[in-house]
Amino acid sequence: ELLREEMLPAVREQGIAEFCDVFCEKGVFSAEESRRILLTGRQYGLLPKIHADEIEAIGGSELAGEIGAVSAEHLIVCPPSGIASMASGGTVACCLPATSFYLGAAYAPVQDMVQAGVPVAMATDFNPGSCPCLNMQFVINLGCLKYRLTPEEVLTAVTLNGAAAIDMADKVGTVEAGK
Protein backbone atom coordinates (compact mmCIF):
# COMPACT_ATOMS: atom_id res chain seq x y z
CA GLU A 1 0.00 0.00 0.00
CA LEU A 2 2.93 2.34 0.68
CA LEU A 3 3.90 2.12 -2.99
CA ARG A 4 0.40 2.71 -4.29
CA GLU A 5 -0.80 5.33 -1.82
CA GLU A 6 2.34 7.35 -1.10
CA MET A 7 5.27 6.63 -3.36
CA LEU A 8 3.59 6.58 -6.79
CA PRO A 9 1.69 9.83 -6.15
CA ALA A 10 4.98 11.44 -5.01
CA VAL A 11 6.77 10.21 -8.14
CA ARG A 12 4.02 11.73 -10.28
CA GLU A 13 4.05 15.01 -8.35
CA GLN A 14 7.83 15.32 -8.69
CA GLY A 15 7.83 14.22 -12.35
CA ILE A 16 10.86 12.01 -11.81
CA ALA A 17 9.88 8.87 -13.76
CA GLU A 18 8.19 7.78 -16.95
CA PHE A 19 7.71 4.14 -16.00
CA CYS A 20 6.37 2.08 -13.15
CA ASP A 21 8.45 -1.11 -13.01
CA VAL A 22 7.78 -4.01 -10.68
CA PHE A 23 9.67 -7.25 -9.97
CA CYS A 24 7.08 -10.03 -10.17
CA GLU A 25 8.82 -13.00 -8.61
CA LYS A 26 8.28 -15.43 -5.77
CA GLY A 27 9.34 -13.72 -2.55
CA VAL A 28 9.05 -10.24 -4.06
CA PHE A 29 5.70 -9.20 -5.59
CA SER A 30 3.00 -11.67 -6.63
CA ALA A 31 1.23 -11.31 -9.97
CA GLU A 32 -1.80 -9.78 -8.23
CA GLU A 33 0.31 -7.33 -6.22
CA SER A 34 2.18 -6.45 -9.41
CA ARG A 35 -1.10 -5.84 -11.22
CA ARG A 36 -2.30 -3.44 -8.53
CA ILE A 37 1.01 -1.55 -8.50
CA LEU A 38 1.22 -1.26 -12.29
CA LEU A 39 -2.40 -0.20 -12.73
CA THR A 40 -1.99 2.41 -10.00
CA GLY A 41 1.15 3.64 -11.73
CA ARG A 42 -0.78 3.92 -14.97
CA GLN A 43 -3.39 6.06 -13.18
CA TYR A 44 -0.53 8.43 -12.37
CA GLY A 45 0.64 8.53 -15.98
CA LEU A 46 3.47 6.01 -15.58
CA LEU A 47 3.89 3.38 -18.28
CA PRO A 48 4.03 -0.22 -17.01
CA LYS A 49 7.17 -2.38 -17.20
CA ILE A 50 7.74 -5.66 -15.40
CA HIS A 51 10.65 -7.88 -14.42
CA ALA A 52 9.26 -11.40 -14.58
CA ASP A 53 9.97 -15.10 -14.96
CA GLU A 54 13.62 -14.82 -13.94
CA ILE A 55 13.60 -17.69 -11.43
CA GLU A 56 10.00 -18.93 -11.42
CA ALA A 57 7.03 -18.32 -13.68
CA ILE A 58 4.31 -16.95 -11.39
CA GLY A 59 2.21 -15.10 -13.97
CA GLY A 60 4.35 -12.05 -14.66
CA SER A 61 4.74 -12.50 -18.40
CA GLU A 62 1.03 -13.19 -18.76
CA LEU A 63 0.32 -10.02 -16.78
CA ALA A 64 2.70 -8.03 -18.99
CA GLY A 65 0.73 -8.86 -22.11
CA GLU A 66 -2.64 -8.55 -20.41
CA ILE A 67 -2.04 -4.96 -19.30
CA GLY A 68 -0.01 -3.97 -22.36
CA ALA A 69 3.25 -3.41 -20.52
CA VAL A 70 5.87 -1.59 -22.57
CA SER A 71 8.35 -4.36 -21.79
CA ALA A 72 8.97 -7.42 -19.69
CA GLU A 73 12.55 -8.12 -18.57
CA HIS A 74 14.39 -11.39 -17.84
CA LEU A 75 11.87 -14.04 -18.99
CA ILE A 76 14.35 -16.88 -18.45
CA VAL A 77 11.57 -19.33 -17.56
CA CYS A 78 8.79 -17.68 -19.60
CA PRO A 79 6.06 -20.23 -20.37
CA PRO A 80 4.21 -20.51 -23.69
CA SER A 81 1.20 -18.77 -22.13
CA GLY A 82 3.38 -15.77 -21.26
CA ILE A 83 4.79 -15.63 -24.78
CA ALA A 84 1.27 -15.71 -26.24
CA SER A 85 0.11 -12.98 -23.87
CA MET A 86 3.06 -10.71 -24.68
CA ALA A 87 2.49 -11.25 -28.41
CA SER A 88 -1.17 -10.25 -28.15
CA GLY A 89 -0.43 -7.34 -25.81
CA GLY A 90 2.39 -5.84 -27.87
CA THR A 91 4.91 -6.18 -25.04
CA VAL A 92 8.63 -6.10 -25.87
CA ALA A 93 10.55 -9.03 -24.37
CA CYS A 94 13.79 -7.58 -23.01
CA CYS A 95 16.05 -10.57 -22.59
CA LEU A 96 19.24 -10.39 -20.56
CA PRO A 97 21.60 -13.20 -21.61
CA ALA A 98 24.55 -12.05 -19.50
CA THR A 99 22.43 -12.61 -16.38
CA SER A 100 21.86 -16.22 -17.44
CA PHE A 101 25.58 -16.54 -18.10
CA TYR A 102 26.64 -15.23 -14.68
CA LEU A 103 23.95 -17.16 -12.81
CA GLY A 104 24.68 -20.36 -14.71
CA ALA A 105 20.97 -20.41 -15.51
CA ALA A 106 18.96 -21.39 -18.56
CA TYR A 107 18.48 -18.89 -21.36
CA ALA A 108 15.14 -17.29 -22.22
CA PRO A 109 13.12 -19.08 -24.94
CA VAL A 110 13.87 -16.36 -27.47
CA GLN A 111 13.26 -18.46 -30.59
CA ASP A 112 9.74 -19.23 -29.34
CA MET A 113 9.20 -15.51 -28.76
CA VAL A 114 10.41 -14.58 -32.24
CA GLN A 115 8.20 -17.24 -33.84
CA ALA A 116 5.20 -15.92 -31.87
CA GLY A 117 5.83 -12.37 -33.08
CA VAL A 118 7.09 -10.93 -29.79
CA PRO A 119 9.62 -8.14 -30.39
CA VAL A 120 12.84 -9.10 -28.60
CA ALA A 121 15.26 -6.56 -27.13
CA MET A 122 18.52 -7.35 -25.34
CA ALA A 123 20.42 -5.50 -22.63
CA THR A 124 23.15 -6.06 -20.04
CA ASP A 125 21.16 -6.01 -16.75
CA PHE A 126 24.28 -4.58 -15.11
CA ASN A 127 24.03 -4.92 -11.34
CA PRO A 128 26.37 -6.05 -8.55
CA GLY A 129 24.24 -9.02 -7.51
CA SER A 130 23.70 -11.15 -10.58
CA CYS A 131 25.28 -9.51 -13.62
CA PRO A 132 28.53 -7.52 -13.36
CA CYS A 133 28.59 -7.00 -17.12
CA LEU A 134 28.54 -3.66 -18.96
CA ASN A 135 29.83 -5.16 -22.22
CA MET A 136 27.20 -5.00 -24.97
CA GLN A 137 29.53 -6.88 -27.35
CA PHE A 138 29.36 -9.82 -24.95
CA VAL A 139 25.56 -9.54 -24.85
CA ILE A 140 25.48 -9.47 -28.67
CA ASN A 141 27.68 -12.57 -28.84
CA LEU A 142 25.44 -14.40 -26.37
CA GLY A 143 22.42 -13.40 -28.46
CA CYS A 144 23.90 -15.17 -31.45
CA LEU A 145 25.34 -18.15 -29.56
CA LYS A 146 22.70 -18.87 -26.92
CA TYR A 147 19.53 -17.40 -28.41
CA ARG A 148 20.46 -18.55 -31.93
CA LEU A 149 19.56 -15.15 -33.36
CA THR A 150 21.06 -14.03 -36.65
CA PRO A 151 23.38 -11.01 -36.58
CA GLU A 152 20.57 -8.97 -38.14
CA GLU A 153 18.11 -10.08 -35.46
CA VAL A 154 20.61 -9.24 -32.71
CA LEU A 155 21.26 -5.81 -34.24
CA THR A 156 17.51 -5.14 -34.23
CA ALA A 157 17.26 -6.42 -30.63
CA VAL A 158 19.90 -3.99 -29.35
CA THR A 159 18.80 -0.97 -31.39
CA LEU A 160 15.21 -0.61 -32.60
CA ASN A 161 13.68 -3.09 -30.16
CA GLY A 162 15.83 -1.71 -27.34
CA ALA A 163 14.35 1.70 -28.10
CA ALA A 164 10.86 0.16 -28.16
CA ALA A 165 11.49 -1.33 -24.70
CA ILE A 166 11.71 2.23 -23.36
CA ASP A 167 8.89 3.55 -25.58
CA MET A 168 11.25 5.57 -27.80
CA ALA A 169 11.26 3.65 -31.10
CA ASP A 170 9.67 6.63 -32.83
CA LYS A 171 12.64 8.83 -31.82
CA VAL A 172 15.74 6.59 -31.69
CA GLY A 173 16.86 3.07 -32.51
CA THR A 174 17.44 3.39 -36.26
CA VAL A 175 19.52 5.55 -38.54
CA GLU A 176 17.05 7.43 -40.72
CA ALA A 177 15.98 10.95 -41.49
CA GLY A 178 14.11 12.55 -38.62
CA LYS A 179 15.58 10.42 -35.84
Predicted regions and their residues:
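Metal-coordinating catalytic core of metallo-dependent amide/deamination hydrolases
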Residues: 1-58
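Active-site-adjacent C-terminal substructures of enzyme catalytic domains
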Residues: 47, 57-171
